[in-house]
């Protein structure tokens, strides 16, 4: 009997993905790739954005402000995870997905339309930073939400494998942003790209937003959440349950300080500061710098 149970469990784990499981992983991953694309465009174009929105300052100060604006989106991501994690626990994963992707896509599109500092003065960088904050909040909710959604569709013994696809989306989103930037630079030429062509990758995000919304609307609610809701077992105070318990809070702090924080420093230094350093310090032309980072991925 025990041997038969073991064989059954092994057979279930070795079975391939179902069509529905593949669609859940593809839809969740693709939408998250597009969100990373939106988030990383700023970092990939930080030197040009600094010249457009902080033009009143010397080059060194301009570069610092451009990096600080990029950091603003990064710093609010944990708050996005808290806010949208709570929303997801109350109203469901699917609708939270739609909210986060709409916030991210529209914020990115507006950056492409935003007048620079020479046109509207201090309002330009102020609005830019506000949009970066919205992007950070949206991404904070999206990334964890996507992993949770996929995990709740995963059969026993395959949760780590299924959610691992979500972990590839950050690199794919950065790569996609660099490819679009390289194509636009080639099509417009460097001078036109620095003047107005840099806006095109931001405006293109509205097309990706449309695709993402269409895909997300085809998804069903998470079966785990739906079952908890039907049985009246959904959490009424998810934040309190997660953080008021020291045993849970200790794990969160350990993961944040011991793992995620260090990983974030290494990743952003290796990709974005390297790109920024190539262009601003070593004076490598933008096309070559983008190409080098894209090849390194």
Predicted features, each with a name:
Residues 217-239:
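Flexible cytoplasmic inter-helical loops of multi-pass small-molecule transporters
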Residues 114, 120-140:
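Hydrophobic core of transmembrane alpha-helices in multi-pass small-molecule transporters
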Residues 42-43, 248-297:
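Extracytoplasmic gate region of multi-pass secondary transporters
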Residues 46-79, 97, 122, 126:
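Extracellular/periplasmic helix-loop-helix junction of adjacent transmembrane segments
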